[in-house]
């Protein structure tokens, strides 16, 4: 079995736990996920099965969308609801004040990851150091926020809902924290849902319970997405090469290209034969070179 599953992760379990559940349901060993979702977060978690794990970079380095709620008035150790309160404020921000500062959080922005994150500090995960009460500082880095929009605001609950479209590496918890600091009222993520990861969207996502039902009924086609699902931006060459050339590609050998019109203006391609995956290849100087070969 190989391909992708668009899992709708529930709140309360880790991304690693989802992988364990999928392994048990499908009785497969080679499973991975693209883009960690915190235990308190829900939403889209792309799951790679079998040879699809070789394509993880194509599922991770994509735009992602989130809907999240910020609770104003407190700063917490984890920058979400699970942490301890470290600062408080009685200031209640106004809708106009929030909207006014949003442009500062769009584009290439400098961001410091939360201390409770998977960033390495001298070879140790930051969250492990934070749990042990060790003091350390994480370096800031530049990340790309494509869009940040204030959806709603509640003075009664002192909360605000946001829509975020961003690229790889953005921490939603850091955005909530920094919004609160800029407004002078503090803030943390009270609720977080990922609604899109590249081509993985809510409309075809399934729960773990639904996956179990479909698998037990033998309805593999209703949940397993094809290997090429994350390669829709790459040139697809199906039944272009002869059997000898396909054998060479499978063995990692380069192939001289004669029909340049088929691969004009591209440096990568996905090769298949009779719709069966063969390899991801690079293209340069009229030569195709296997980069990732699939064993299917």
UniProtKB/Swiss-Prot annotation:
GO biological-process terms attached to the record: mRNA pseudouridine synthesis; tRNA pseudouridine synthesis
Active site, per annotation: 38
Record keywords, A-Z: Isomerase, tRNA processing
Transmembrane segments: none
Enzyme class: isomerase
The keyword Repeat appears for this protein: no
Catalyzed reactions per annotation: uridine(55) in tRNA = pseudouridine(55) in tRNA
E.C. numbers: 5.4.99.25
GO MF term set: RNA binding; tRNA pseudouridine(55) synthase activity
InterPro entries: PsdUridine_synth_cat_dom_sf, PsdUridine_synth_N, tRNA_psdUridine_synth_TruB, TruB_C
Keyword Isomerase assigned: yes
Pfam family, one: TruB_N
The family this protein is said to belong to: Belongs to the pseudouridine synthase TruB family. Type 1 subfamily.
Free-text function comment from the UniProt entry: Responsible for synthesis of pseudouridine from uracil-55 in the psi GC loop of transfer RNAs.
Name recorded for this polypeptide: tRNA pseudouridine synthase B
UniProt source species: Ehrlichia ruminantium (strain Gardel)
Gene: truB
């Amino acid at each position: 079995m190989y391909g992708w599953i668009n899992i709708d992760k529930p709140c309360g379990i880790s991304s690693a736990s989802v992988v364990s559940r999928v392994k048990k349901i499908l009785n497969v060993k080679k499973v991975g996920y693209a883009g960690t979702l915190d235990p308190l977060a829900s939403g889209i978690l792309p799951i790679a099965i079998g040879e699809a794990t070789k394509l993880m970079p194509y599922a991770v380095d994509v735009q992602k969308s989130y809907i999240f709620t910020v609770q104003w008035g407190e700063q917490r150790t984890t920058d979400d609801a699970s942490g301890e309160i470290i600062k408080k404020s009685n200031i209640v921000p106004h809708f106009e004040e929030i909207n006014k500062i949003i442009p500062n959080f769009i584009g290439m922005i400098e961001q410091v990851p939360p201390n409770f994150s998977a960033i390495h500090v001298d070879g140790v995960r930051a969250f492990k150091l934070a749990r042990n009460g060790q003091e350390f500082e994480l370096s800031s880095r530049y990340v790309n926020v494509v869009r940040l929009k204030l959806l709603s605001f509640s003075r009664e609950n002192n909360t605000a809902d946001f829509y975020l479209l961003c690229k790889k590496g953005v921490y939603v918890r850091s955005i909530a924290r920094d919004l609160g600091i800029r407004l002078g009222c503090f803030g943390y993520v009270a609720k977080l849902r990922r609604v899109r990861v590249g081509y993985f969207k809510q409309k075809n996502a399934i729960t773990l319970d639904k996956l179990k039902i479909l698998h037990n009924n033998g309805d593999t086609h209703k949940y397993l997405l094809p290997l090429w699902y994350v390669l829709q931006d790459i040139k697809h060459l199906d039944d272009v090469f002869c059997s000898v050339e396909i054998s060479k590609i499978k063995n990692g050998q380069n192939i001289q290209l004669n029909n340049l019109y088929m691969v004009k203006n591209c440096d990568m391609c996905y090769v298949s034969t009779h719709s069966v995956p063969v390899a991801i290849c690079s293209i340069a100087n009229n030569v195709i070179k296997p980069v990732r070969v699939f064993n299917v």
